[in-house]
């Protein structure tokens, strides 16, 4: 059976991405990262989601990039803001995060002799992160072609971003059609230890908007009523 490495954070998009990989018939290897994120409950969700989808293996790699600061998701001196709705790159951007994650995924995929890596990046209804754009995915594909033994031998590992052109509502509809239980997911940047959401950060607002537009009941549990 063909193999794939799927990046899973415990959130809505990456869980949908895992469901897509399963629907394509991949033997799934899930990869998560403990990078010093404040919303650590997403990793608890990732463990449950990986087990739910019966992945072959789930690895959680510990990184120390949070020690470098520079993002409200990792730096205790920076507060995660409420939803701003502007087009500038927000303070929740973690510098080079997807490049670091995909590089490790690329190494594992080559070790496994996997043919694909799937990432839940989306350029629609997103927070404006530069490493979630189609041109970024294309650039990393070029890197994968050049930087691996498989690539040099003409069997390059494919970098797939199946949600890249989908709105949040379209992503939710897709996942719903594949049987995803979104109550298992944690998207909030300020989620507490139980995985309850704040309801006001960028991620929460985009998630609420997605369920509303998809006309699907939002199963998200909030710290306080929003």
From Swiss-Prot:
Residues at which ATP binds: 8-18
InterPro entries linked to this entry: QueC, Rossmann-like_a/b/a_fold
Protein EC: 6.3.4.20
Cofactor(s) essential for the protein: Zn(2+)
Catalytic activity, as annotated: 7-carboxy-7-deazaguanine + NH4(+) + ATP = 7-cyano-7-deazaguanine + ADP + phosphate + H2O + H(+)
Cofactor detail note: Binds 1 zinc ion per subunit.
A single GO molecular function term of this UniProt record: zinc ion binding
Binding locations of Zn(2+): 188, 198, 201, 204
Keywords, ordered alphabetically: ATP-binding, Ligase, Metal-binding, Nucleotide-binding, Queuosine biosynthesis, Zinc
One GO term (biological process): queuosine biosynthetic process
This protein's pathway: Purine metabolism; 7-cyano-7-deazaguanine biosynthesis
Top-level taxon in the UniProt lineage: Bacteria
Pfam families documented for this protein: QueC (PF06508)
Protein family according to the UniProt entry: Belongs to the QueC family.
Xref: HAMAP family: QueC
Annotated function: Catalyzes the ATP-dependent conversion of 7-carboxy-7-deazaguanine (CDG) to 7-cyano-7-deazaguanine (preQ(0)).
NCBIfam families, alphabetized: 7-cyano-7-deazaguanine synthase QueC
Protein name: 7-cyano-7-deazaguanine synthase
Record organism: Coxiella burnetii (strain RSA 331 / Henzerling II)
Gene: queC
């Amino acid at each position: 059976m063909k193999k794939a490495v799927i990046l899973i954070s415990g959130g809505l998009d990456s869980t949908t991405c895992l469901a897509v990989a399963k629907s394509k018939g991949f033997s799934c290897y899930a990869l998560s990262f403990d990078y010093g994120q404040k919303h650590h409950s997403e990793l608890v969700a990732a463990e449950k989601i990986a087990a739910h989808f019966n992945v072959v293996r789930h690895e959680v790699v510990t990184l120390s990039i949070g020690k470098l600061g520079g993002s409200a998701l990792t730096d205790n001196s920076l507060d995660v803001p409420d939803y701003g709705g502007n087009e500038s790159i927000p303070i929740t951007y973690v510098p080079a995060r997807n490049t670091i994650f995909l590089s490790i995924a690329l190494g594992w995929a080559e070790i496994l002799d996997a043919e694909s890596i799937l990432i839940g990046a989306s350029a629609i209804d997103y927070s404006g992160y530069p490493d979630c754009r189609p041109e970024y995915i294309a650039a990393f594909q070029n890197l994968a072609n050049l930087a691996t033994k498989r690539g040099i031998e003409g069997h390059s590992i494919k970098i797939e971003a199946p949600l890249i052109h989908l709105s949040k509502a379209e992503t939710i509809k897709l996942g719903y059609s594949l049987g995803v239980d979104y109550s298992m997911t944690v998207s909030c940047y300020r989620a507490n230890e139980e995985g309850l959401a704040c309801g006001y950060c960028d991620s929460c607002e985009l998630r609420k908007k997605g369920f509303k537009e998809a006309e699907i009941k939002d199963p998200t549990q909030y710290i306080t009523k929003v």
